[in-house]
Every structure is written in structure tokens, then in C-alpha cells.
């Protein structure tokens, strides 16, 4: 194939200041994809390890702001959004004063990303967790398993995020 005609997939990654987003961006760079990172900070604020993610394009994005999500995803116009942004402090999610914030990020923010992806016909990769299950199963988990049983606010919020994406 003539290199002049090869297409470079553009991928927007949310939550690049976190471990998963950081690693996804570095993997995209290794594979030659065009990666654009996003996080709530106006500049990359994750691990300063000198890896590719520290110099790749990044945009500020509060995923709980539906208008901002639509604007950024429309402007970036990615082929794919890998949604790594989330409230991940599992134990703190149980605090009464944190529950609304957890839901705003993990459910409403995820819904905002899904809606914007649909509007620009971008694929969306959603990262969930095993916390959507209670850990009591005795058989290997199957990809289409619906035996959800979250035991925590965090687990419920990630399940609700999954359902938002699926719908």
C-alpha cells in the first residue's frame, strides 16, 4: 500500500492524567495512531515520566459539562474515543458527601461522552470494572453476562455508566 494513502486513525482519550489514560496514550503513540488526550486540567498533569503522552496534544475537558463534551468531541472529530476518565477512589465513593460527584462523573459524564460520540459517528470504548459483580460466581465470566450485583457506590456507578453507553 502506498504510504501517502494510508489513513491514521485519530483517537481521543479521556482521563489522561490517570494511570490507564496515560498508558493508553503511550500505546497509541507506539502504534502510530494520532492520539489526543483530555483531562479536567488545562494541560497534561499526569506522571512526568518523559513518555510520549507528556508531549502529545491535550485538551481540557470536564466530562460532566455536556456542552463542553459535545464541543470538544466535535472539534477533535475523532474516529474513536477511549473513555478512561472516572471517579476511581472506590472507598471514598461511599462517603455521603461524594456520592453525587461519583455519579456525575461515572454516569452522567459517561452519558455525555456517549451522546457526543453518537453525534459525530465516533466509536466509543468504555472502561468498566469487575466491581459491577459481587465476586460470588463460580464459573468464568462470559462477555454477555448480565448477572450484575454491584456491592458499592463505585460499582453501581460504573454499571450505570455501562448501561448508559449500551443504550
What residue ranges belong to the model's regions?
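N-terminal Rossmann NAD(P)H-binding glycine-rich loop of SDR-like oxidoreductase domains
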Residues: 9-31
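A short helix->loop->beta-strand "cap" motif at the edges of active sites that frequently abuts
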Residues: 120-122
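Rossmann-fold cofactor-recognition segment
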Residues: 51-65
